[in-house]
C-alpha cells in the first residue's frame, strides 16, 4: 500500500507481508492477533490472508493505553515526562472528535483535529486520514462506509518521536 504509513515508509508493508506470510506458512495458525494501534497494518494483513488463501482469523486486539490515554508503544520510553503529557492530547482530541461526527462533515472534522493537535506546542501532525476501515480508501462523507476509522501519526517533542494512533468513528 502507498497510503499513510506505506507512503511515508516505502517498502514497509512489503516487508511486513513477506515476514508475516512466511510465519503463517510455517506456523499454520487458526488465529493471529494484531494490535489495533497500527490499524493500517491490520487491514493489510487481512488482505494478505485473503490473497494467500489461508484460513486464518485475524483478531483485532484493542489498544492498550496508559492512564492518560496515550497508546502504549516502545517509542513512549523515548519521550520525556512533559512530552508524554503533551502526547496524551492526541487521544483526547481524537476521542472528542467522535462527538462531532453528527455536526461536522468529514473534511471539516479532519481539519479540526489536525488544527487542534498542531496548535499544541510540541505536537505536529504528519498525517490524519479518515478512511474505510477495511479498504483504507478515504471517505468523503460519513455514509460512504459502514466502517470508518481515523488514522493519525503525530510527531511529539524536540527529538521528535513519531507516534501512531487511531479512532473508530463507525463500525
Predicted features along the sequence, with ranges:
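Active-site loop ensemble at the mouth of alpha/beta enzyme cores that anchors a bound cofactor
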Residues: 1-3, 69, 161
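Divalent-metal (Mg2+/Mn2+/Ca2+)-assisted nucleotide/phosphate chemistry catalytic cores
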Residues: 1-33
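Short clusters of hydrophobic/aromatic residues that line enzyme substrate/ligand-binding pockets
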Residues: 3-4, 72, 79, 136
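Fold-independent oxyanion-binding glycine-rich loops
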Residues: 7, 36-37, 154
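Flexible loop residues that form catalytic
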Residues: 21, 37, 133
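Solvent-exposed alpha-helices and their adjacent loops that cap or buttress functional pockets
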Residues: 24-27, 51-53, 71, 142, ...
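Glycine-rich, Lys/Arg-enriched anion-binding loops that position phosphate/diphosphate groups
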Residues: 38-126, 131, 171
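Phosphate/ribose-recognition catalytic cores of enzymes acting on nucleotide-derived substrates
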Residues: 112-171
Amino acid at each position: 500500500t502507498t497510503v499513510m504509513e506505506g507512503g511515508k515508509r516505502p517498502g514497509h508493508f512489503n516487508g511486513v507481508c513477506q515476514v508475516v506470510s512466511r510465519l503463517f506458512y510455517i506456523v499454520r495458525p487458526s488465529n493471529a492477533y494484531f494490535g489495533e494501534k497500527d490499524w493500517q497494518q491490520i487491514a493489510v494483513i487481512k488482505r494478505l490472508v485473503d490473497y494467500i488463501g489461508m484460513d486464518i482469523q485475524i483478531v483485532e486486539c484493542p489498544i492498550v493505553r496508559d492512564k492518560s490515554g496515550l497508546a502504549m508503544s516502545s517509542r513512549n520510553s523515548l519521550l520525556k515526562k512533559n512530552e508524554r503529557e503533551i502526547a496524551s492530547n492526541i487521544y483526547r482530541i481524537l476521542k472528542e472528535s467522535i462527538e462531532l461526527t453528527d455536526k461536522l462533515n468529514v473534511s471539516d472534522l479532519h481539519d479540526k483535529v489536525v488544527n487542534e493537535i498542531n496548535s499544541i506546542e510540541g505536537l505536529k501532525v504528519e498525517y490524519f486520514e479518515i478512511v474505510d476501515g477495511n479498504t483504507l480508501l478515504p471517505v468523503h462523507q460519513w455514509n460512504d462506509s459502514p466502517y470508518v476509522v481515523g488514522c493519525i501519526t503525530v510527531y511529539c517533542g524536540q527529538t521528535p518521536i513519531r507516534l501512531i494512533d487511531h479512532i473508530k468513528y463507525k463500525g
